[in-house]
Amino acid sequence: MKIGLVKANFPGERRVPLLPKDIKDFKNEILVEEGFGKFLDIDDQEYSDKGCHILSRAEVFAESEAIFSLKLIQPTDYYHLREGQMIIGWTHPFGSGQSFMKEQALPKKLIVVDLDSNSPCIYYENEIFESGIPKGLLYKNSFYAGYAGVLDALLQYGLIPTEETKIAILGSGNVAQGAFSSISKYSSNIRMYYRKTMSIFKENYTKYDIIINGIEIGKDDDPILSFSEQKSLKKGTLIIDVAADAGNTIEGSHFTSIDAPIYENAGKYYYVVPNTPSLIYRNVSQELSKILSENIFRKDCSRFIEKVKPLNK
Amino acid sequence: MKIGLVKANFPGERRVPLLPKDIKDFKNEILVEEGFGKFLDIDDQEYSDKGCHILSRAEVFAESEAIFSLKLIQPTDYYHLREGQMIIGWTHPFGSGQSFMKEQALPKKLIVVDLDSNSPCIYYENEIFESGIPKGLLYKNSFYAGYAGVLDALLQYGLIPTEETKIAILGSGNVAQGAFSSISKYSSNIRMYYRKTMSIFKENYTKYDIIINGIEIGKDDDPILSFSEQKSLKKGTLIIDVAADAGNTIEGSHFTSIDAPIYENAGKYYYVVPNTPSLIYRNVSQELSKILSENIFRKDCSRFIEKVKPLNK
Amino acid sequence: MKIGLVKANFPGERRVPLLPKDIKDFKNEILVEEGFGKFLDIDDQEYSDKGCHILSRAEVFAESEAIFSLKLIQPTDYYHLREGQMIIGWTHPFGSGQSFMKEQALPKKLIVVDLDSNSPCIYYENEIFESGIPKGLLYKNSFYAGYAGVLDALLQYGLIPTEETKIAILGSGNVAQGAFSSISKYSSNIRMYYRKTMSIFKENYTKYDIIINGIEIGKDDDPILSFSEQKSLKKGTLIIDVAADAGNTIEGSHFTSIDAPIYENAGKYYYVVPNTPSLIYRNVSQELSKILSENIFRKDCSRFIEKVKPLNK
Amino acid sequence: MKIGLVKANFPGERRVPLLPKDIKDFKNEILVEEGFGKFLDIDDQEYSDKGCHILSRAEVFAESEAIFSLKLIQPTDYYHLREGQMIIGWTHPFGSGQSFMKEQALPKKLIVVDLDSNSPCIYYENEIFESGIPKGLLYKNSFYAGYAGVLDALLQYGLIPTEETKIAILGSGNVAQGAFSSISKYSSNIRMYYRKTMSIFKENYTKYDIIINGIEIGKDDDPILSFSEQKSLKKGTLIIDVAADAGNTIEGSHFTSIDAPIYENAGKYYYVVPNTPSLIYRNVSQELSKILSENIFRKDCSRFIEKVKPLNK
């Protein structure tokens, strides 16, 4: 199958999801946009040495049966998408990708292969199909979200924590584990709270200098840190939301960005930058490329078409 | 109340639970055995400067109404214990302290104030009383068990882990968090598994170079790593049981000691050293002394007698 | 003596050189600009509680006999400076402070007390006087320049180094030591080169993925990494100049800034951000305030006038 | 040439200097003692799969033209050595290997190829020949001496350093750099002193909680820490001599061992364990094997005979 890889144009995105060294025994033809490897100083020649075709962005879209885009396809590329094309990547069909599904996927009968960690499925003509992609394939990406987000937040806040800095981490999933690993380089004065021990956090939350959130709560769940609780935090407390669950777990919080990563409200500081794995894109690209090559690019991607075949006659 | 502090004689125990700098406004008289601070280079004079009485071991036992012993009182001291004396410390009444309870506590009507993290209670004449001591008072000690145990195990095994070393941590409680924090100094190639994700561990456990256990399972629970599963681990895999739950979570494993910390079985290596917080006694003593001074030694300890008063008429 | 402390207006400067908790037994009157502690969430009230006078910027300049300014006084404040006033801080009289000396210090007969690490002297009417300030008083600031600069550079470059990343550090002084300490959190694949071993670096420099410079060479010294040597570095090599010795040690390199910290040239990346200690201002302020309180603010600063008294009749 | 590799019998030595994965295109025949890879769980079969001959210890000595022994050949093996045999390894001809040179090398006309970092030479019949081995080939071993020695010393002393722990490192060579990298995982409150700044150390040495020595001074040099200076150190100060320069740099200090690593003298603690790289033998073996394969085992070792040929007619 012809798979097209285009340069990321998602704001702040610098990860390169396929590296020449991992291109081995691919049962797919790979079309790569000129300068695809630029962020990692990889020349086009290195991709063509591995049998890839180097084309312009438009040509890649035009000649590919499937487009791999790590992040959501941006509106500026909508006009490239052709009827029946396959899209592989994080598409967040029930989240930030809803408008893409409505405006592009449905009308153009796109075959959307979503790499969501918990339910990697195929979305086609309002139906959901099992994809055969292992669950948690890219779990480490969430780990990196916590890992890189904490480091960036600390530097932007201007503090290297020490054993004197009291640190709470909410959640014990991959994002929280990445945050825990990252901040452990500097301090072991950390306590990780999860469902069973959250009551202890509620009794002690005002003691913390840094509170790191790694939890995405459900729409109807109560926030873990309400407005009033935030008010009783110490002056100067730093809240790092590496789950980027803006406004939910930390009531009233809003997104920040890589260029303006921290805002202050009533003497507390909030870091709610999304897409933080891209901060350490040189590490993450290595891992992504290895996993995607083994699980997506190596085997013929027409296998995903067969999954939706009956509808796709 | 007269509280006696004697030098630790529990094998390998070097923590000093009370430091002169924390002795302020104590509503108790403190009797300290000569050389009590020796492990931390604290002279007897520094204790007497703070109003403590420096006595021989026998005199401390003889003149104290309550004996503080961080670890279980050892048989060699049984003969010192007098009728109705109070014992404060970790006494493990349902675990390793059962024989102490049977042979000493009951017959001598001792008032046993147990500092157990989850249920800090008073045991007196076969009855259990609420102690008023906050739960999780010494939670950080479990954290240190994981923290120090992992570091010691790595050095004994001869490996500083890198990003190439695949590491699994079982559990997300304090012991597991200490282990996670400790090994994060060297690698972020870590995944922490807990109840909800243990099935993923079961599918992947053979990939790991190091498996760290931070879980104490119940008597009737299945082991998390059975004999057969251990057989299919990679040659040279290191299993660090910082919960020191010998024979349970890791089927068939047995205790090791600080002097002989690792044994090999079928090409796998096992570290099951108990009491690992004592490895970094210089850090832990600081924390213990502060917490115990605030929560145990400052207020009059006769408060514990009042808790059991009706029976103690 | 009346000492005035005004908010930093040096680009990117966020350190607060005096904290209320360190104000004890000062033989000087302290005048503080409103909002002086803002970066560290310290209210004006906390300074007035310690006997400081809270004034507007203009009033501080107007009423102070000495102005403490950590960084060079900026042109926008020149008009505030009065004849015979004392300036205490880093004034770089032979470096970036030359124009200040010429335009302000000399004509207004300012008494300039320079806190330079190697030669902390007083400059007054073209004469240089010994200050009595201990050498190396603020050596740790250079350490932090290396420490924070490396961390920021890595995040901007998008890489957390591992044991696979080959790292060279040039120099063994305080800046180089800070860089060494910082990057050691992530990798031990480091070699520090100094005068005696620089020849070994010259034989091996093309093997390195990251080259960190902690050396300020003399005006007439050869660069340590010439244009041609830079050309033969690996594609993607990151050069972090935490000595910010732009154009000297690394031939042809130029300053970058906190907002645009890295530039690429022929596939190599250059980070040459000056004033990096300010990146971790929350840590550095604590240390600065303690040292400055003990060595500058506590004793009567008129002692510096006496040093230049004969001329100042 | 036939090269024999025997199991280490140097006290505490666990490094395995050749791993099967590095055996490629060797121009030498390799004879390996049974169980040679045991410490790293490498079976004899893995060596024979790579063309090695698996023999008893005696057979290896009997059939090899050259014996590779990382550490000094022990007296228990002297009787194996045959006239004219080659010995490759660290032989310390002017240090601990003097008796070996006198009792074995000279009388049996052994060709001793010493892997000393600064002067890798061949010693044959009282003559010294250039070996062609690059200088600093195994420099990283000294780095590991500092790295592992510091970690072991801290654990034996019972302290994980924090930012409150004042740490001095003497020297800026490879051993000192390893120590610096190791302790930087836990604290950045470190200052490295070398020739130019040693005077500053002499003015401040009593402030330090931990003093790490990475310097081997010359026989006639004054100690860096004299008896009297040691007396004025703080009670409980830990002195870690990872240069293991017992009795010289730290006046009066004596060797300790892995089993009894620390002694106390007048309230100060001394760690002077030699051969500390072997503590982390699993890391160091990987590095040693790669470097030795490339620089020693790959090319025909008879090249060393040719270096001494005229004498060896």
Swiss-Prot record, chains A, B, C, D:
EC number: 1.5.1.24
Thermal dependence of catalysis: Stable to heating at 50 degrees Celsius for 10 minutes. Rapidly inactivated by heating at 60 degrees Celsius.
Listed Gene3D superfamilies: NAD(P)-binding Rossmann-like Domain
Record-annotated disulphide pairs: none
GO cellular component, one term: plasma membrane
Extra facts: No enzyme activity is detectable in the reverse direction with NADP(+) and chemically synthesized N(5)-(L-1-carboxyethyl)-L-ornithine as potential substrates.
Record note on pH: Optimum pH is 8.0. Active over a broad pH range of 6.5-9.0.
Role of this protein: Catalyzes the NADPH-dependent reductive condensation between pyruvic acid and the side chain amino group of L-ornithine to form N(5)-(L-1-carboxyethyl)-L-ornithine. To a lesser extent, can also use L-lysine as substrate (yielding N(6)-(L-1-carboxyethyl)-L-lysine). NADH cannot replace NADPH in the condensation reaction.
PANTHER family registered for this protein in UniProt: ALANINE DEHYDROGENASE
Tree of life domain: Bacteria
Binding site for pyruvate: 15, 71, 92
InterPro entries registered for this protein in UniProt: AlaDH/PNT_N, AlaDH/PNT_NAD(H)-bd, CEOS, NAD(P)-bd_dom_sf
Molecular function per GO: alanine dehydrogenase activity; N5-(carboxyethyl)ornithine synthase activity
Subunit structure: Homotetramer.
Keywords of the record: NADP, Oxidoreductase
Gene: ceo
Reaction(s) catalysed by this chain's protein: N(5)-[1(S)-1-carboxyethyl]-L-ornithine + NADP(+) + H2O = L-ornithine + pyruvate + NADPH + H(+)
Free-text activity regulation comment from the record: Is potently inhibited by the reaction product N(5)-(L-1-carboxyethyl)-L-ornithine.
Descriptive protein name: N(5)-(carboxyethyl)ornithine synthase
Swiss-Prot/TrEMBL GO biological process terms: alanine catabolic process; ornithine metabolic process
